[in-house]
């Protein structure tokens, strides 16, 4: 516990919050260009081939982003929109690609949770 005299001399340091998505630079989304599209394997108890892309952002960062949904049309030089949000079983993946925007197509034949995958309403 500091004395009052010590507090007068130097005030208490404010706690600084560390952002979970620094590459977005306090923006909700960021545009970027895919430099590499590949698959990655998840951490220990899980097993799959998760689709990820290496993206160079307009903020100058190069990050790894997850491609959600079944099937995608991304390739090198595709322009994508990124949002924050990590993938728990892929270390180092802290961003998601937004489906249905820019060069990213929405998920085909998606009926539930369509807005999250950029899918249009089905023709009834």
Swiss-Prot record:
A Gene Ontology molecular-function term? rRNA binding
Q: Can you list the disulfide-bonded cysteine pairs?
A: none
Q: Which residues carry this modification: 3-methylthioaspartic acid?
A: 89
**GO BP terms, alphabetized:** translation
Pfam families the record matches: Ribosom_S12_S23
Q: Which SUPFAM superfamilies match?
A: Nucleic acid-binding proteins
Q: Which GO terms describe its cellular component?
A: small ribosomal subunit
Write down the PROSITE patterns for this protein, in alphabetical order: RIBOSOMAL_S12 (PS00055)
Which keywords describe this protein according to UniProt?
Methylation, Ribonucleoprotein, Ribosomal protein, RNA-binding, rRNA-binding, tRNA-binding
Concerning its family, UniProt says: Belongs to the universal ribosomal protein uS12 family.
Q: Quaternary state and partners of this protein?
A: Part of the 30S ribosomal subunit. Contacts proteins S8 and S17. May interact with IF1 in the 30S initiation complex.
Functionally, this protein is described as follows: With S4 and S5 plays an important role in translational accuracy. Interacts with and stabilizes bases of the 16S rRNA that are involved in tRNA selection in the A site and with the mRNA backbone. Located at the interface of the 30S and 50S subunits, it traverses the body of the 30S subunit contacting proteins on the other side and probably holding the rRNA structure together. The combined cluster of proteins S8, S12 and S17 appears to hold together the shoulder and platform of the 30S subunit.
Q: What is this protein called?
A: Small ribosomal subunit protein uS12
The protein's organism comes out as: Prochlorococcus marinus (strain SARG / CCMP1375 / SS120)
Gene encoding the protein: rpsL
């Amino acid at each position: 516990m500091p004395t009052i005299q010590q507090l007068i001399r130097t005030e208490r340091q404010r706690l600084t919050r560390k952002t979970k998505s620094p590459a977005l630079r306090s923006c909700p989304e960021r545009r970027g260009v895919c430099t590499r599209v590949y698959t990655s394997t998840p951490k220990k108890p899980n097993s799959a081939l998760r689709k990820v892309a290496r993206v160079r952002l307009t903020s100058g960062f190069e990050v790894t982003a997850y491609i959600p949904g079944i099937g995608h049309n991304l390739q090198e030089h595709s322009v994508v929109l990124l949002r924050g949000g990590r993938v728990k079983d892929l270390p180092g993946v802290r961003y998601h690609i937004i489906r249905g925007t820019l060069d990213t197509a929405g998920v085909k034949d998606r009926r539930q949770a369509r807005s999250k995958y950029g899918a249009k309403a089905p023709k009834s």
